[in-house]
């Protein structure tokens, strides 16, 4: 099971270079399992035992299985994750021609570790909006091939490079695509028009706009002398999206189960398709006949917010609290913060620990050092919007927000097992 899950995650990561592609890949899996797409613009008629999914902005998805009994009876078991990761996004007018090279201006999306982006074989993917035969359409594209690179400056020209230096995102991050002649004019939209034709056979009249990100073409892999680790891009947080999907597909229960994977977590979630928007609340409201039933159901429900945790690094162990250093391959981590950067409380933490013990899944705890700031997740945001009890958990990871992150190769199976047990559970606290 462990090897099969890791292989599935590696394939999922390869197919999901952007939130748009991640959502499309999730849709493919759910449709293959018999889930029915719902359109938010239509009237819904969900049925007992039915399986459905909804997307918004092509970058967020809510998938759910209606239980054999009403959600009002036993509540809804929810798992939440996010589809986006820190990256470099192409600017609206990106063409740069400097010293005979064609480059693209980029904007840093989220809290990216920038240094690892240098000297990588980069490709480009995302969503393009265009006009064809008088109609406005959108399509996902993925160049797949390594079409760009951000070369480092040689140490001979930067003698203090190994002493640390501030990276200027405006000047130092534009990737190089090609060499151009002095009188040659680079045309990025023409490149996108060609890609639409090459990848989809579409003859666009004009490219109107786009949301495109660079990504590392090196695929994810199981690594280490004994295969202990899983290395790859976007583990934060496609690992949790994949685990939640597997758990939802693997379980049948009398209770209603739901997976929500939203966009824009890395930049605050404040969007129509982010956790700070109304998407999840609006969808759950439509599953219940009245506002009274909605409130009662939410108070019987529970959310597991799944987002990667900081594993204790052997070279930087002093960055962790001495008693709270999560280890790779030692199971999921319950994340706690007294200032509500995580939504965990003693009741929800206790329930998650109970699930892990019942499934013989190891479990750990994380709290940030008292002299350091703490990150956050969709957990507190969703708990605030819905009023739902929430526990923040995640798998321990090294190099979070790097272009290539590292997790334990045993931990995905741990997470899928406990999330499956959660979806199948008959009683919530």
Swiss-Prot record:
Binding site for Zn(2+): 82, 156, 401
Keyword Metal-binding: yes
GO MF entries: aminopeptidase activity; metallopeptidase activity; zinc ion binding
GO biological process, one term: proteolysis
Enzyme Commission number(s) of this protein: 3.4.11.-
CDD domains the UniProt entry points to: M18_DAP (cd05658)
Cofactor: Zn(2+)
Keyword Membrane part of the UniProt annotation: no
InterPro entries to which the protein is assigned, alphabetical: M18_aminopeptidase_2, Peptidase_M18, Peptidase_M18_dom2
Domain of life: Bacteria
Keywords (A to Z) from UniProt: Aminopeptidase, Hydrolase, Metal-binding, Metalloprotease, Protease, Zinc
GO cellular component, one term: cytoplasm
Protein family according to the UniProt entry: Belongs to the peptidase M18 family.
Cited NCBIfam families: PRK02813.1
Protein name in the entry: Probable M18 family aminopeptidase 2
Lineage: Bacteria, Pseudomonadati, Pseudomonadota, Gammaproteobacteria, Pseudomonadales
């Amino acid at each position: 099971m462990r090897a099969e899950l890791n292989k599935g995650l590696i394939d999922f990561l390869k197919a999901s270079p952007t939130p748009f592609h991640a959502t499309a890949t999730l849709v493919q899996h759910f449709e293959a399992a018999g889930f029915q797409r719902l359109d938010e613009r239509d009237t819904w008629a969900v049925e007992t035992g039915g399986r459905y999914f909804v997307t918004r902005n092509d970058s967020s998805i809510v998938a759910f299985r209606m239980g054999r009994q009403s959600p009002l009876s036993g509540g809804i078991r929810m798992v939440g994750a996010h589809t986006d990761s820190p990256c470099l996004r192409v600017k609206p007018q990106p063409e740069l021609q400097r010293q005979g090279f064609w480059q693209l201006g980029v904007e840093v999306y989220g809290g990216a570790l920038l240094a690892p982006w240098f000297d990588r074989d980069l490709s480009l993917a995302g969503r393009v909006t265009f006009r064809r035969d008088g109609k406005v359409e959108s399509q996902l594209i993925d160049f797949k091939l390594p079409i760009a690179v951000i070369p480092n400056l040689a140490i001979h020209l930067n003698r203090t490079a190994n002493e640390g230096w501030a990276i200027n995102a405006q000047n130092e991050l534009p990737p190089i695509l090609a060499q151009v002649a002095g009188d040659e004019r680079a045309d990025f939209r023409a490149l996108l028009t060609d890609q639409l034709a090459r990848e989809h056979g579409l003859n666009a009249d004009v490219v109107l706009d786009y949301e495109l990100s660079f990504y590392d073409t090196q695929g994810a892999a199981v690594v280490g002398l004994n295969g202990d680790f899983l290395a790859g891009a976007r583990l934060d947080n496609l690992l949790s999206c994949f685990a939640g999907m597997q758990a939802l597909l693997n379980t049948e229960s009398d209770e209603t189960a739901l997976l929500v994977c939203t966009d824009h977590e890395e930049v605050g979630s404040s969007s129509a398709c982010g956790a700070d928007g109304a998407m999840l609340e609006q969808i759950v409201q439509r599953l219940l006949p009245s506002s009274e039933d909605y409130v009662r159901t939410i108070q019987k429900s529970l959310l597991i917010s799944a987002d990667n945790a900081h594993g204790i690094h052997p070279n930087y162990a002093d960055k962790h609290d001495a008693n709270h250093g999560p280890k790779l391959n030692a199971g999921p981590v319950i994340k706690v913060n007294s200032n509500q950067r995580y939504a965990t409380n003693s009741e929800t933490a206790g329930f998650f620990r109970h699930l892990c013990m019942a499934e013989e899944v190891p479990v750990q705890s994380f709290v940030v050092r008292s002299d350091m700031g703490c990150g956050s997740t969709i957990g507190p945001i969703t708990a605030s919007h819905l009023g739902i009890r929430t526990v923040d958990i995640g798998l321990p990871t090294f190099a979070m927000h790097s272009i290539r992150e590292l997790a334990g190769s045993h931990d995905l199976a741990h997470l899928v097992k406990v999330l499956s047990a959660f979806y199948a559970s008959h009683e919530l606290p």
